[in-house]
Amino acid sequence: MTLEELVASDNAVQKMQAVTAAVEQLLVAAQRQDRLTVGVYEAAKLMNVDPDSVVLCLLAIDEEEEDDIALQIHFTLIQSFCCDNDIDIVRVSGMQRLAQLLGEPAETLGTTEARDLHCLLVTNCHTDSWKSQGLVEVASYCEESRGNNQWVPYISLEER
């Protein structure tokens, strides 16, 4: 491996770590500001009613769920809709870390009902210009990935 290859590899690792941290920061901020839609069904409803408010779509899946055909079909439809509406998309693994970031599911009538974390939409208010640094960094990463013909970039959220 040449020096240039080593430097490029180190830069790629640092970039991935920065984008992962930006996604985590963005999710926490969006949830706190009530700008996060969680769940495949809820995401589909929102994109049908107000697609212009959506600024980022995260499709989350772990390796053991990759064979879930129904989920893959949902993802394909959501990706298509996002591409048609110029919504940035990121594929994410690390469902447990995602659950940690978004908090434990609320208890409903004595039973714990797990939320569907497979699709997350970050929305932007039409009335203000809400832009977090995390959103800017993730959008930049998505644009850079599209320039490299990777239309749906992938990141891995690591448990802590």
Curated annotation (Swiss-Prot):
Expression tissues: In myeloid precursor enriched BM cells.
GO BP, sorted A to Z: apoptotic process; cell differentiation; positive regulation of apoptotic process; positive regulation of JNK cascade; positive regulation of MAPK cascade; positive regulation of p38MAPK cascade; regulation of cell cycle
Cystine pairings recorded for this chain: none
Gene induction: By cytokines.
Domain of life: Eukaryota
UniProt keyword Transferase present: no
UniProt keyword Cytoplasm, yes or no: no
Cellular compartments per GO CC: cytoplasm; nucleus
UniProtKB keywords: Apoptosis, Developmental protein, Differentiation
Known partners and oligomeric status: Interacts with GADD45GIP1.
Annotated family: Belongs to the GADD45 family.
Function comment: Involved in the regulation of growth and apoptosis. Mediates activation of stress-responsive MTK1/MEKK4 MAPKKK.
Protein's name according to its UniProt entry: Growth arrest and DNA damage-inducible protein GADD45 beta
